[in-house]
Amino acid sequence: MVVEKKKKMEYQAEPKELVEGIMGRGHITPWELLKIVSWKSAKGVAWLSLNTEEEIISYTAETVAGLKSGLGLSDVLATEMTDELWELWEAKAGELIGAEKKYAADGVPTGLLRLHGVGYPVATALLGLLKPEVFPVMDRWAIETIFGKGASKKRWQTKSKYREYTQLLVSPKITELQKIETLRGRDKAAMNISMGVYKV
């Protein structure tokens, strides 16, 4: 495997320094959300201005509380994940991420997807930033690596697909991913493989 390093803009650096404050305070501030969305997808930044400060604090407080109450899982790579645990994992991911208006049961968006500027990839990035041992970041680049070329053209932004993606990171078929010891490291590598940063 050859690793080519590309210089990232400062806003593209994963804002790990925010995690302790967020988890301690129990919510994400508007400024922190801006930094997180800028890291994951600059496309959503302008949309963030459509959220009120109260919405950002309230919706992210639900997420942080949900992560703290959790599943009793501290690391999916270090846990013998039974079908029952995966069902619980999927339900929790679905609850925290939520559903967009067009897919919500009553037409009302839920979870993090209630926030303007937060789509499925950004929602998984929020979970992955705050709980990287349990929730990976899932985006179109990683989808292409894990499910094959063209996979991002199909509907992949669902809790069942997120579960399947996570299971394939926990038990990867790609040799390069098997060598990586952290879930976050594996999802980063999956993105980089598709983007051509890692050559396999």
Q: Which residue ranges define each predicted feature?
A:
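C-terminal accessory module of base-excision DNA glycosylases/AP lyases that mediates lesion recognition
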Residues: 1-36, 135-200
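Small-residue-rich anion-binding loops in enzyme active sites
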Residues: 13-65
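Residues that form generic nucleotide/phosphate-binding pockets
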Residues: 21-22, 36-39, 66, 70, ...
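Alpha-helix boundary/capping residues
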Residues: 40, 63, 92-93, 130, ...
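Secondary-structure boundary/capping signal
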Residues: 44, 101, 134, 150-151
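Helix-hairpin-helix/helix-loop-helix acidic hairpins
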Residues: 45-118
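Catalytic DNA-binding helix-loop module of base-excision-repair DNA glycosylases/AP lyases
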Residues: 105-147
